[in-house]
Amino acid sequence: MAYITVGTENSADIELFYTDQGTGQPVVLIHGFPLDGESWGKQQAALLDAGYRVIAYDRRGFGASTKAGSGYDYDTFAADLHALIEDLDLDDAILVGFSMGTGEIARYLSRYGASRIAKVAFLGSLEPFLLITDDNPDGAGPQEFFDGIAASVREDRHAFLTGFFRDFYNLDENLGSRISQEALDASVATARRAGNTAIAAAPLTWPTDFRADLAAITVPALILHGTADNILPIDKTGRKFTELVPEATYVEIEGAPHGLLWTHGAEVNEALLAFLNG
């Protein structure tokens, strides 16, 4: 098993677990909430088949990475990604983020630049800014909304996950057709491996303001979003995002929920590979 050390807490190392497979141009996969690097299974297989080197890591607090008690903010998440890229000495790398993992990309580029990066892909993104404020009146929700999510997780994370995955995969429409009960159960099991601190702190990072980071997207970019996303609605995210980064390649997947990496894996892979190979 492969780990890198990104810090310490109370004299113990904070380690990130990662997998590194294949040869060729490196692609770094950055997972969404509340999953881990293995949630990229359908994309990982397609990328390996296409001749890429595929690196997937577990964000701190999730999967097999250290269940740290702090560091749940995008400056730290970006620093963790930077540490991985530096430790593996990656050049000409492609960063592919999903959901919460898109935030790492935006903040990484603004903090560390694109000297090691060839392309970036934002799938089901958080950007540009979810919080309703005076200068962002059409955001997704006020601070109280995100505070309430975090409180629900702290109160009963297991009950929270039931409702979350219902909307994550749009189960009323997709269970039994685009996602099996077994795949859903696997997602829940993965989420239950997350640290208590991490899973409660993560929702408080979602209203991060990424607008100032977007100018740092100076490499070719893909923005891809599902039109039926009930977690990060497309009108609050993908469509606004592409207006601010008009040079990006923009793809909408009709009828796809937030969890489109699984439910619409073939469509995601087709668009992703077309972008990477273009």
Predicted regions and their residues:
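Alpha/beta-hydrolase fold catalytic core
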Residues: 1-28, 49-52, 90-91, 118, ...
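Conserved HGGG/HGGXW glycine-rich cap/lid loop of the alpha/beta-hydrolase fold
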Residues: 9-70
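Catalytic active-site module of serine/aspartate enzymes centered on a nucleophile-bearing elbow/loop
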Residues: 247-278
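Short beta-strand/loop motif that positions the catalytic acidic residue
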Residues: 217, 223-225, 229
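Conserved alpha/beta-hydrolase "acid-adjacent" motif
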Residues: 230-236
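Conserved acidic catalytic loop of the alpha/beta-hydrolase fold
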Residues: 76-93
